[in-house]
Amino acid sequence: MRYSLISNYCLNKDIKYLITAHHKDDQIENFFIRLLRGSGLTGLSSMSANIKYNDRLKIIRPFLNFNKIDLKYTTLNYFKTYIKDPSNEDEKFLRVRIRKYRKNMEKEGLNTKRIINTIQNLSSANQTLNFYKNKAIYKHASFVSKNKCVINRKIFSEESAEIIFKFFSDILSLVSGTYYPPRSKKVTNLIYRLKKNKFTKSTLGGCIVEEKDDFILISKELKIRKILNQLRK
């Protein structure tokens, strides 16, 4: 929701680059939030310093290697003040509760350095898988247009389960033009159904997924069609 509001503002003002103040502590909190949600390797890897939010906006995070306390010190010394978000103290938010849990974790030796090392190791493994995922996209996917992709069913017999999962997550995100891919569980369920011979048609993550002979067609779901589908439900 927050990114959606900010990105809409940027698009209305023709702003092409959004710089955020995400720091090392944010990375750690993000790691634990996704760990609690049962995220896979991609979710547990570190935040990206540069990401493409959509076709018109890029997000840049230059402070990922800085501690929050250092950024606060710099801000207070140069600008004499900083904006404090009251929600950062509200324990109804998981992120706030995780900050409190971390104090106990540090007593057991799970300090910032060790957590960051773990995140970096996971990120390195994720980059390796992304290399093979990109090769799979080049081999098995053909983009008919910006919002339409044809996939060869041979991917199910020629690639590993993790590569297939990352492949479909990326394709769905690319075709729909959305920043976040669908939830892992939904992508896994889609792959399971696609492997069955009785798959006909489905929608997921703003995309329509259907079979065409020995191929899978993924196309962007038009807004009017999406509204009609919701009304039918």
Predicted regions, residues:
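Short, charged, solvent-exposed linker or helix-capping segments at domain edges/interfaces
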Residues: 7, 113, 228-232
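Structural element of the ATP-grasp superfamily
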Residues: 6, 71-75, 168
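ATP-dependent adenylate-handling ligase core
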Residues: 1-7, 41
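Hydrophobic (often cysteine-bearing) scaffold residues that line and stabilize catalytic clefts
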Residues: 2, 24, 94, 160, ...
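Catalytic subdomain that performs nucleotidyl-dependent activation
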Residues: 12-21, 29-118, 152
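AMP-forming adenylation/ATP pyrophosphatase catalytic core
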Residues: 51-56, 100, 108, 119-233
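Residue-level detector of well-ordered alpha-helical segments, enriched
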Residues: 27, 114, 163-167
